[in-house]
Amino acid sequence: MSCPYFEQKSCTSCTHMNTPYSQQLETKDNALRTLFSDVAQSAWLAPVQSDSMHCRNKAKMVALGAAHQPTLGIESVQDGTPISLVHCPLYTQDSQALLAYLQEWIRTSGIPPYNKVKKKGELKFVLLTRSQARGEFMLRFVVRSEAALERIRHNLPRLQQAFPAVRVISANIQPIHMARLEGEQEIFLTDAHYLLEEFNGVPMVVRPKSFFQTNPHVAAQLYATARDWVAELKPRQMWDLFCGVGGFALHCAPHAEQVIGIEIEEEAINSAKLSAQQLGIGNLRFSALDSAAYSQAQTQAADLILVNPPRRGLGQALSEQLEQLAPQYLIYSSCNPVTMQQDLAHLPSYQVERAQWFDMFPHTDHAEVMMLLVRQ
């Protein structure tokens, strides 16, 4: 894939952009098999490939420059000058068009980007999420204070007229002078508060602060694969720990007698519950709890426990809890194979029966890995 930002060395996030995609897959596959050297070669299934461009449904843009010349993108690693990334080819074409419009809209609206050196200005980030099922957008302005809200509100009508697909608009207040992406306070500027997404016929509700996979094409296959594995095992009870907005639990519920989804973020749990209501699923329960605390409080494990932890992994304590609870099956989905490999060392009673990786982040070293572990 051709990328002008990579060719000009203005953005090097996609470190393997100039490597043929087939070679990227081979290199990543070999690296994962080496990392998980204890996993039998026969356990590995073929990797799930990504589209090489227009594959991301999220954009996180730093607001840079000045009010008369704002830039959405990143700072140059060489000299700190603003670099616009509104036409990054990983984004869909309608996302690129919207980002380019927003960059000009910020200028004509007179909204000053935040300057971290001078500690002045208002707009810190522009966060964009796209629903691939509906082609609709959620737009979030991360601002230092409420000072810019009047200008944002005043100029919203022409933004919405130019891009009626922008369904949800909000302002997130992040007053702290540090590299935090968002603050606690979310102010909605539209009647709609969430996006509707759909994978494999399963409705998903996306709210501003909920974690959501960034590559919808690959995410759909990740959920479908977990569903198929669970359908083969037919568990009586299943737990989905770190369930987020419920993607795995919602897909797997038809193939288990009871499914319990646990997630500490209450907003994500509210989204998951709404999806379950839309599907009319009666054997699925979601609770806003800490996954480790929930696991520790149980005296008897489910037949199958699915875990999808953040990049830090399960950690030794939770891994050892799961080892003691001794479910017959574990399905572990990870966005960080290194911490996943460390966690597996604390699960000595389990053998990896099936392993597959999903190229959620093409042109990088990152991979989403999912494994089926069976207690011996």
Swiss-Prot record:
Taxonomy, superkingdom: Bacteria
Alphabetical list of Gene3D superfamilies matching this protein: 2.40.50.1070, Vaccinia Virus protein VP39
Keywords assigned by UniProt, alphabetized: 4Fe-4S, Iron, Iron-sulfur, Metal-binding, Methyltransferase, rRNA processing, S-adenosyl-L-methionine, Transferase
Binding, [4Fe-4S] cluster: C3, C11, C14, C88
Enzyme's top EC category: transferase
PROSITE patterns per the UniProt record, alphabetical: SAM_MT_RNA_M5U, TRMA_1
The reaction(s) this protein catalyses: uridine(747) in 23S rRNA + S-adenosyl-L-methionine = 5-methyluridine(747) in 23S rRNA + S-adenosyl-L-homocysteine + H(+)
Positions with a binding annotation for S-adenosyl-L-methionine: Q213, F242, E263, N308
GO MF, one annotated term: 4 iron, 4 sulfur cluster binding
EC identifiers of the protein: 2.1.1.189
A biological process term (GO) from this entry: rRNA base methylation
Active site: C335 (nucleophile)
Annotated function: Catalyzes the formation of 5-methyl-uridine at position 747 (m5U747) in 23S rRNA.
Family: Belongs to the class I-like SAM-binding methyltransferase superfamily. RNA M5U methyltransferase family. RlmC subfamily.
HAMAP family according to UniProt: 23SrRNA_methyltr_RlmC
Protein name stated in the entry: 23S rRNA (uracil(747)-C(5))-methyltransferase RlmC
Biological classification of the source: Bacteria, Pseudomonadati, Pseudomonadota, Gammaproteobacteria, Vibrionales
